[in-house]
Amino acid sequence: MKKKLLSITLCLTMVVAMLSGCKTQKEPTNGENVSTEAPKATDKPVDTATPAPEPFEITLGIWPEDTLPDDIKLHEGYVETFNTTHPNVEVVPAYYKYATDTFVPLAESGKLPTIFESWYTEPQKLIAGDFVADITDILQERGWLDAINPAIKELLSKDGRIYGIPRDGYALGLMLNVELFEEAGLVDANGYPLYPKTWTELAETAKKIKDATGQAGLCLLAKDGAGGWHFSTIAWAFGATLTLDNGDGTFTANVNTPEAISAMEFVKSLKWEYDVLTPDPTNEDWGSGFVNLGTGTAAMYIAANDAVNQPTQVNGLPVDKLSLCPLPAGPNGDQFSLLGGTPYFFSKDATKEQINAALDYLEIMGKAPVATDAAIAGMRADAQNRVNNGVPVIPRFPCWIDEQVLAAEKQIITEFGNVDTKLYDSYYDATTTEGNLRMEEPGSAQDLYAELTKVLQAVITDKNADVASLMEKANTNYQTILDGLKK
């Protein structure tokens, strides 16, 4: 029951906040006189140094990957600003993309970055493993503790202590390559894509696109756990609940229900009846999905508002040829958007001084619950970098509840908006509707996704695969994992 209340609280809070941030934007500025580098800070971040500060370093797992040179330049501007108030701190770039198979070895070797990102499914695992620092007292001293969305704070806490802060949130939707919709003639009189409202319509739309363009209608993931992650949203639309919370710290696998089986049968039909998928979904992962969408080899892909840079900046899709719409509804009209997000964590080996320095860096980035001149400068620099790189400047899901921060973000979106908001309105309309947002399944979501991906791989590669038997096996395997959680 506690988890249900948490989910409801989080969803309602998101809805209220998003309603204030999704209005139609004015025409974008040309950006000619706006620097892409972070301006000098006007407000000095919290000074935790002693009168004669000892030198130390912080390693930034949040540093951009090498393939994003403009993002690196943006961070170099942040570092320049940071150095004006932290001359004794050396900033060491240490890009790290969280993955369940690399994290534990990295943590056990003592090589975790000072600050790094993860997923909202992971906090309790990281806390239980003693991999991340307790930052409760530090946040209290900075006045940040009560600025976090209460429901998100609970996700990042254990026994009243908090171990992380939010970067942002997301809600899964359906990304569209508008160029392929145009080529297939699937646009309305005003040129906007005719996106599918139901999963059956998605299959039919995907078939029309493949017949007209020769490209895949949908990129389905079936290589790793991301496949099961995406499938869970399809299953919900078909009426499934994949894990039951027993309310006593135990969970029951619910993968073998008629609703879940029906959803998997539908996915199987996308391959063997409609034939609308990319050549080998078992080689498709989160990143390759954006490659397909951005380069025009797939017309639709399940993705979220926090990843609009992937098809555009990373893979070359023009900023005005991307659209984001709601996930389709199921046979009974059920329609949900999986709600997740990215938290920041800090290595358990980091000192208080290192953690405070990393938090100061987040403030300069504009990722803190403050609306200082330094923070707003960081927000503006980030928005200008998006404009320069053809990335949509659109509202994010708010994880902080400070009104000044929310107002500053809204103003920046209005100032730097660079897309036709009608390409995104349906997504925001859906995700700000009460009851639409749904938290990831309780229990052990990543293990659930892994089991579901095994089934996806089977039904995609074997036309005669017995879906019911495969789902029964997945249910048994997942229940074994759930039973071990309390041991």
PLM features per residue range, with description:
Residues K4-I8, C22-G129, Q140-D146, D188, ...:
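Conserved N-terminal structural module of periplasmic/extracytoplasmic solute-binding proteins
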Residues A307-L317, G333-L338, F345-A450:
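C-terminal lobe and pocket-closing loops
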Residues T50, A133-I148, G191-Y195, A240-M264, ...:
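Short, solvent-exposed loop/beta-turn-alpha elements that line the ligand-binding surface or hinge
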